[in-house]
């Protein structure tokens, strides 16, 4: 039997593509290498599944063509996604601009999509490893598990390399290369950064709301704000994830990357407050004094780095040393030496070059009937539901084009 479309990968983009194509009365085969559908969806949003975000802009996406994704998200965006899930009987709720299934369970999303796939009689094969795909004349041939399937169209929805234990092992890049597509440089993104410094390890476990500024060869390349987590290996947390793409890109280009943290961004009058406290609390040691401002581990790290005795009475501290401490509170330097791997990354940066993909249909410019969607493309979003929105959008866009045939 020849299918109208074969979809390789049953993550968010693959399941959306299958439902959309089947909704256009196309005969669909969905192939998944894992034992269950949507495993990566189950891990998103700490198991709550952050579907999308109220704020949506072109700058929420990265890649060699940052503007590639946004016009398609305008075509099928947040409101369309909400309506789609409501049509399947799943309510969506909003919390501070972040959208989740009303159950706050990622399993609800996977179950809802799976139920619709079955209702539409989509053929599904799990634990199916696609080893080869080719096109001869007007037909695609997809091989794996000692079987071969035929179709008029082929959608690659395999994901990238992030979280390989959930199914994304990079196999889609080989399939795309076999069709002569270029793969841009790929690397982990939305991931923790590794840092050096003997005093930094002493801060492990600390969480601190900070302004984050990233410099590459002394040039500012990114800024963020939020709760930074200090770890044994370096720094993590949402603001670090948000800037990780730019920091890692610079590291891979052999640039010197440093992060500067304003550890007290809420204190615009830090110097004035310090002067007031000095008058009323001059009986404290330097360490005790600044523990009224910051986590004690951070205070200790700052004093150690500046070689200031933490037991020294604050009344005896010189104006020069006081200014040095205040400066470091507002410009705490973290030298970035590396980054965590794909096993800890939320998304893959880079992928199939969007220069070879038709914007608006996601069909290959090199081969008619071949489509590439989701994380496999050189498109990665920031934290907050942007990558799932892109996955659903891209699956819908590609399958809708096939549906019009």
Where are these regions (language model features)?
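N-terminal Rossmann-like FAD-binding beta1-loop-alpha1 element of flavoenzymes
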Residues: 3-30, 398-403
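Short hydrophobic core segments
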Residues: 6-8, 31, 130, 149-165, ...
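Glycine-rich FAD pyrophosphate-binding loop
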Residues: 22-46
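An anion/pyrophosphate-binding glycine-rich loop and adjacent beta-alpha core
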Residues: 35-37, 42-43, 51-58, 91, ...
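Glycine-rich active-site loop/strand segments that organize a redox cofactor
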Residues: 48-96
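Feature captures the FAD/FMN-dependent oxidoreductase FAD-binding
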Residues: 75-153, 299
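A glycine-rich dinucleotide-binding beta-alpha-beta segment and adjacent secondary-structure elements
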Residues: 125-127, 300-380
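Glycine-rich loop(s) and the adjacent beta-strand/alpha-helix scaffold that form part
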Residues: 153-199
């Amino acid at each position: 039997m020849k299918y109208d479309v074969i979809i390789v990968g049953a993550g968010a983009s693959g399941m959306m593509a299958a439902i959309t194509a089947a909704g256009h009365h196309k005969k669909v085969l969905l192939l998944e290498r894992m034992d269950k559908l949507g495993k990566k969806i189950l891990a998103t949003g700490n198991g709550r599944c952050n579907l999308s975000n109220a704020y949506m802009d072109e700058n929420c996406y990265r890649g060699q063509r940052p503007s590639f994704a946004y016009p398609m998200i305008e075509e099928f965006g947040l409101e369309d996604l909400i309506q789609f899930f409501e049509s399947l009987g799943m309510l969506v709720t909003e919390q501070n601009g972040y959208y989740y299934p009303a159950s706050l369970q990622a399993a609800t999303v996977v179950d809802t999509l799976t139920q619709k796939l079955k209702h539409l009689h989509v053929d599904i094969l799990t634990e199916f490893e696609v080893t080869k795909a080719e096109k001869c004349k007007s037909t695609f041939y997809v091989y794996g598990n000692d079987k071969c399937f035929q179709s008029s169209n082929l959608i690659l929805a395999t994901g990238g390399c992030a979280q390989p234990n959930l199914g994304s092992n990079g196999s889609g890049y080989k399939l795309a290369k076999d069709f002569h597509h270029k793969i841009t440089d790929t690397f982990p993104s939305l991931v923790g950064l590794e840092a050096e410094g003997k005093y930094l390890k002493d801060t492990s476990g600390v969480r601190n709301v900070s302004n984050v500024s990233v410099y590459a060869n002394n040039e500012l390349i990114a800024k963020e704000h939020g709760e930074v987590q200090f770890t044994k290996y370096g720094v993590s947390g949402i603001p670090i994830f948000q800037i990780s793409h730019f920091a890692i890109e610079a590291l891979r280009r052999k640039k010197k990357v440093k992060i500067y943290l304003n550890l007290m961004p809420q204190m615009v009058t830090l110097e004035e407050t310090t002067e007031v406290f000095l008058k009323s609390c001059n009986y404290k040691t330097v360490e005790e004094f600044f523990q009224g401002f910051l986590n004690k581990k951070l205070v200790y790290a700052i004093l150690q780095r500046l070689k200031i005795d933490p037991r020294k009475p604050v009344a005896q501290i010189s104006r020069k040393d006081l200014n040095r401490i205040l400066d470091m509170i507002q410009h705490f330097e973290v030298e970035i030496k590396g980054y965590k791997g794909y096993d800890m990354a939320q998304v893959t940066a880079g992928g199939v070059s969007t220069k070879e993909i038709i914007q608006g249909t996601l069909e290959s410019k090199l081969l008619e009937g071949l489509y590439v969607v989701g994380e496999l493309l050189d498109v990665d979003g920031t934290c907050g539901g942007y990558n799932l929105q892109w996955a659903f959008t891209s699956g819908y866009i590609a399958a809708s084009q096939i549906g019009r045939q």
